């Protein structure tokens, strides 16, 4: 599914391996090196998602107890989707099927986290019925869109939560790449 205003995209324009999309810079400003992070919105069903997994941070102390999407940094030379699969194996001990990418409603190709750090996010699913939090998280839990709004999300993840809720409400739940 393609959404020119952002949202979920199936067919992706692929970046050369090891490169990252760059955010627009004002004229005359040198772009800083950007670290790419990948995140997973683990849904109960890629074809018609009703719930997604929220993960409560265990550390560092200033983020402990806040909720986020599982994921992590892309290593040099690693493709973003390969990094996503690796991070989910490491953090949650799961193998996933990767669905569509969730993009911002802006011209940016990734979600800004903080200066020098941006995140690309995909919907994913797994066949594992039970998911344990691992060492990175205090707990994980399945939430509906309404329940998700009651959680204390990391500030950079809130726009992603809102986009997921918007996509689910709009019935754009067919989240498998074509």
Predicted regions and their residues:
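Conserved N-terminal beta-strand and adjoining loop/helix that marks the start
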Residues: 2-4, 27-52, 73, 104
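Intrinsically disordered, low-complexity repeat/linker tracts enriched for polar/charged residues
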Residues: 9-15, 20, 25, 30, ...
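Short loop segments at secondary-structure junctions
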Residues: 44-48, 58, 125-130, 145-147
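Conserved Nudix-box catalytic region and its N-terminal flanking loop in Nudix hydrolases
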Residues: 49-91
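A generic structural signal for short hydrophobic patches within well-formed alpha-helices
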Residues: 74, 148-149, 161
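Active-site-adjacent beta-strand/loop module that shapes the phosphate/pyrophosphate-binding cleft
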Residues: 95-96, 100, 105-131, 141-145, ...
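Charged phosphate-binding loop/patch that engages nucleotide di/tri-phosphates or the phosphate backbone
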Residues: 158-178
């Amino acid at each position: 599914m393609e959404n020119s205003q952002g949202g979920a995209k199936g067919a992706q324009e692929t970046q050369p391996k090891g490169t990252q999309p760059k955010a627009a810079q004002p004229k005359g400003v040198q772009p800083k090196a950007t670290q790419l992070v990948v995140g997973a919105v683990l849904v109960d069903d890629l074809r018609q998602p009703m719930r997604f997994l929220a993960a409560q941070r265990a550390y560092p102390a200033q983020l402990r107890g806040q909720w986020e999407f599982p994921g992590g940094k892309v290593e040099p030379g690693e493709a973003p989707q390969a990094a996503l699969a690796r991070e989910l194996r490491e953090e949650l001990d799961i193998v996933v099927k990767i669905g569509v990418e969730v993009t911002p409603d802006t011209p940016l190709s990734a979600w800004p986290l903080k200066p020098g750090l941006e995140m690309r996010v995909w919907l994913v699913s797994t066949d594992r019925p039970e998911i344990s939090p691992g060492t990175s998280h205090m707990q994980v839990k399945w939430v509906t869109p309404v329940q998700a709004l009651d959680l204390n999300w990391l500030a950079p993840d809130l726009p992603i939560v809102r986009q997921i809720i918007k996509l689910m409400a709009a019935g754009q739940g067919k989240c498998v790449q074509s």
